[in-house]
Curated annotation (Swiss-Prot):
PANTHER family: THIOREDOXIN REDUCTASE 1-RELATED-RELATED. Keywords: FAD, Flavoprotein, NADP, Oxidoreductase. Its cofactor is FAD. This is Ferredoxin--NADP reductase. SUPFAM superfamilies: FAD/NAD(P)-binding domain. Homodimer.
Length: 318
């Protein structure tokens, strides 16, 4: 039986920072992630994305952010390709994780949980599927090509800005208004090699001479169609999340997210949660906010486990 002070489920940016902050306070920590690499959704889907809302970084790529967070985790043990399936409570109030790891506290930092991309709602062939993408791990494959990007959120806008450096881009959204940053929209509108097509939905997709013919239907206009010839398609429709495992453990959810107190405590003893997995009034899904939640959770875990200790809450304490 392996014993730890803290187990963290999720090795994305928020989980990584929580682990390093736990190390700072001397907690023996183990981290689990279902993916086969550290970094969570950012490393898996958006490693080249420029993140612009991290304090002190005007812009930092997702992969670089993960790398720097990992540098802080010299004492954390990581177990990858491991989806935690079972937790139970022992007589000594410790938590048994998957019948092998005994921990004093548990911190959930799983983001939206198991995620699958929302797929393009068109009938396609195997040949066509080779040109449809749901992430941009390797932007070089889009260079010097005509690329259609479907979606209206920050990911779609970020991808369009990135690919506009090397490609001709069609950004297609079902509404006239985009959900992402207005500054990104304005920048795209100023680029000659970017065309914004709104409000349009994909209607048909065919492969002809190794180039795709994408037929678009204008929303609200029964006979208004546009055809664009493209080499590659990037779909940014978001993800379907699955937190059924949390319900199985008895964790209280609110609209499929974990309900927490001001201390980031769940309804279960010694179980905390942070990041996009949680909800409370006024919360917004931002990485910087998740970092703060990690500090709140670890500080309260320390007080929970070691109430007799005088806490130094952060490295800048006098």
């Amino acid at each position: 039986m392996e014993k730890y002070d803290l187990a963290i489920i999720g090795a994305g940016p928020i989980g990584l920072f929580a682990a390093s902050f736990a190390n700072l306070h001397g907690l023996k920590t183990i981290s689990f992630d279902a993916l086969d690499e550290i970094g969570g959704q950012i490393n898996m889907l958006y490693p080249q994305k420029n993140i612009k809302d991290i304090p002190a970084f005007p812009s930092i790529k997702g992969k670089k952010l993960v790398s720097q967070l990992l540098e802080q985790n010299i004492n954390t043990k990581f177990i990858l390709s491991h989806k935690v399936k079972e937790i139970s409570f022992l007589e000594n109030e410790n938590i048994l994780v998957d019948k092998k790891y005994e921990v004093k506290s548990l911190l959930i930092a799983t983001g939206l949980g198991a995620f699958k991309p929302k797929t393009l709602p068109l009938s396609t062939t195997l040949d066509v599927n080779q040109h449809i993408h749901y992430s941009m791990q390797h932007p070089e494959i889009f260079a010097n090509k005509k690329v259609a990007i479907l979606g209206g959120g920050d990911s779609a806008l970020d991808w369009a800005l990135e690919l506009a450096n090397t490609s001709d881009v069609f950004l297609i959204h079902r509404r006239n208004e985009f959900r992402g940053l207005e500054s990104s929209v304005n920048k795209l509108k100023s680029l000659k090699n970017v065309e914004l097509l709104t409000p349009y939905l994909p209607k048909d997709l065919q492969l002809n001479n190794n180039r795709m013919e994408l037929v678009l239907h204008k929303v609200g206009a029964s006979q208004d169609f546009v055809t664009k010839n493209v080499d590659e398609i990037l779909v940014a429709y978001g993800f379907k999340s699955d937190n059924r495992q949390l319900r199985k453990w008895g964790i209280k959810l609110d609209h499929n997210l974990i309900a927490v107190s001001q201390k980031m405590h769940t309804n279960l003893p010694h179980v905390y949660a942070i990041g996009d997995a949680i909800t409370y009034p006024g919360r917004v899904p931002m990485i910087a906010l998740g970092f703060g939640e990690a500090q709140i959770a670890i500080s309260n875990i320390m007080q929970d486990l070691f109430p007799e200790k005088t806490m130094t809450f952060h490295s800048t304490s006098i």
